[in-house]
Each structure stands twice: as C-alpha cells, then as structure tokens.
Amino acid sequence: MARKPSRRKCPTCGEAGVKKNGRTSKGAIRYRCTHCGASYCASRPDISRKAELDQFVNWLTGKNAIGDLQVSSSTWQRRTNWCWRVDPVIVPTGQIYDYIQIDGTYLPYGWCLLTAVNSGKVLAWQWCNQENKAAYKQLLKRLPEPLMVITDGQAGALSAIKDQWPNTRVQRCLVHIKRNIRTLTTINPKIPAHKALWGLAKRLVVIEDLNQADQWVGLVQAFHDQWGKWLNHKTYKNQVPPEQVPFWIRPNQQWWYTHQKARRAYNLLANQTRKATLFTFLDPSLNKQATTALPATTNELEGAINAALKALIYNHRGLSEPHMKKAAQWWCYLHSEHPLKPGQLIQPHHLKPGPKPGAKQAKPGPKLWDSAIDYDPKYQDGSLHIRKGWAGH
C-alpha cells in the first residue's frame, strides 16, 4: 500500500509534501520540502523554554558550576537570562497544622530569611534585614493559627505570635535553651553552681514524658534552695579597685550581682518554667488534638532548611544580590509541600526582554576628567591653559 503524502506544509513555499530528511547533530528531526527543496527543523519554543527553565533551576539549586554544564558561560547566561524573571511563590492552602517551626537565617548582603516549616516542608518565607516583630508578623499572617509554634525565643517572634496567633501555645526550643546555658557556664565548668546548671541543661533536652519533666522542675527548685543566697551576693563599687570594675557597669551604678552568669542561667530556666513554655510538647490536651508527634526543638528547621540554604549560597558564592535571593527562593519553593514543575510557572511576560537602560545624561558643569581643557569662559577666566616652553630653564 502506497504511503500517504505528508500534510505538513513547507514554511518557505507553503506547499504540502514535506518529508523527513535525517537528523541534525543535536538529534532534532530535519525536514525537506519535495517542491522547493528547502530544509528546516520544526521548533517548539514552549517545550524548549520549559526545558531551559528546568535545567536552570537544577543548576541554581544544585552543586554544579557553570563549567560542569558543557556549555560556555556566555552561552549559558544568554540562554537563561529570562529565567531570572520567573518568581516562585508558595500558594497558601489554608491547612491548619499541628505545629509550625519558625526561625531566621542570615545570608549575604545583609539579608535575613525567615521561614515557617512543618514536617521539613517550607510553608512560607519572608525577607527582612533582621529578625523583628514586623517581619515575623508578615510571615505569620499568611498561615492559619496552629496548635503549637516552636521558636528559639527571639523577642520579635514571641511578640508577633502574641498578636497574630493569640491562641497558639508556644514551645521554646530546648536545644537553644541548652546552648544559652552553655554560653554562660562553659562546656567544662569549674564552679560547683555552674556544674549544676550545666547538668540541668543537659538533662532538659532528653526529657520525653511528664514524670521526667516533674523531676526536672524539682531539681531546679532544689538548686535554688541550695544556691539562692549565693546567687544574691552583691559587689559594691567602692570596695573594688577601679581597674577591676567590669566594663559593663554604668558610671552611676554603685553595686552589681557578683555571680552574674550563674544568675542569668538560673533565671532563664526558672522564668521559662514559670511561663510553661518548656514542656508544651508534653501537654496531654494538645497531644489529643494533634495527629502527629509534637517536637520540642527546631532541629528540623535548623539542619534541613537553614543549613541547606547556607550551603546553597556557598556553592554559588559570587551571585549578585537579586540572584542570591532568587536562588534561596527557588530552593524554598522546591522544598514546599506541593511545588509545581518550574516549567508550569512560566508566564508570557517572563519571556519578554526587560527595558534597556537609557543613556546616562551628563551632569551640568565642567567635566572632572577629560582629555582637553575647556576654554568656555563660563567655567574659567582663561588663566588655565596648556603651558609650553622651558618654564624659565
């Protein structure tokens, strides 16, 4: 049976009757018109653009350098320049979560990236110059109020939680509490009171039930009974040589607590115990409502999100400020709950080239650097001119 003639039309002469004529060196099918002899390759810009964006995002969120892509840097930059205009955005689902972890990580160019995470998935992010109440409020208002929020205790975060999620219970990250105690007592304390405080901090992070929590609270009370008077010891300025006065003492301050670090460490544990923010994850009423286990730390966020973002920026060190931010946003988007394929985010305006920068207008007045002298009388009286001769020699 004879083969049916091709209905594909030639883009040159417009006649039907085009047949396949091998492949190009890149593997694309080559077509040849049986009427005019023109040869061409069919193109699908939409598919090509999706493939370019997929390759671009894989490079941007991966470890490979441009040299590993088997293409010159100029070709890669020209081909993927439009990809920087695609903005990944996490669309809120409205789901109410059992818990949300919030924290910020500092990146180059003075930026701080706040993230909200559940089960290792990024729910939202917010750029800011530092962690503060306003930035955290912008982050929290995109998400419905959860049962519990885990935070490292940053003041701006706690204030924003109180305003945006007034009914949400707060869980202080126990690992951050331990780190704060370690900073005050050191990891190998010599003073007996410091040893006791460091022991309480180490015991805090391994508590798994209410019985252990009750025992720990009893140990904190026992520490106060034993060391309470010692913590209240005071040092008076008139009894200390001037060179031994601590640098942080105000000029009009007449006394201070002798054991400042031990006192701060104890107050940290005692205050958080009174506020009931250390063992929120063990609350029976919350665990009855929750469908998953409630964590006591932000380790999941610190290790899986913040550390990975810093590693990403390090692997692509040298990116400009907007490109650095776009790389972090793409990484967060790909690690959200329901990310679309990058090619599905392409919009027509992404493919249009941006406006070219206009020519800079010269500032009015004489030039500061030039190749000749301006003899315009508006700018000089004529005394400035090129000197010739031997200048008296």
Please report, for each region that a protein language model flagged, where it lies by residue.
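Conserved beta-strand -> loop -> alpha-helix junction used to position metal-binding or nucleic-acid-contacting
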Residues: 152-201
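Short, amphipathic alpha-helical "recognition" segments used to contact nucleic acids or chromatin
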Residues: 47-63
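Short cysteine-rich clusters marking metal-coordination/redox-active sites
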Residues: 10-13, 33
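A broadly conserved sequence feature marking short terminus-proximal activation segments
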Residues: 1-8
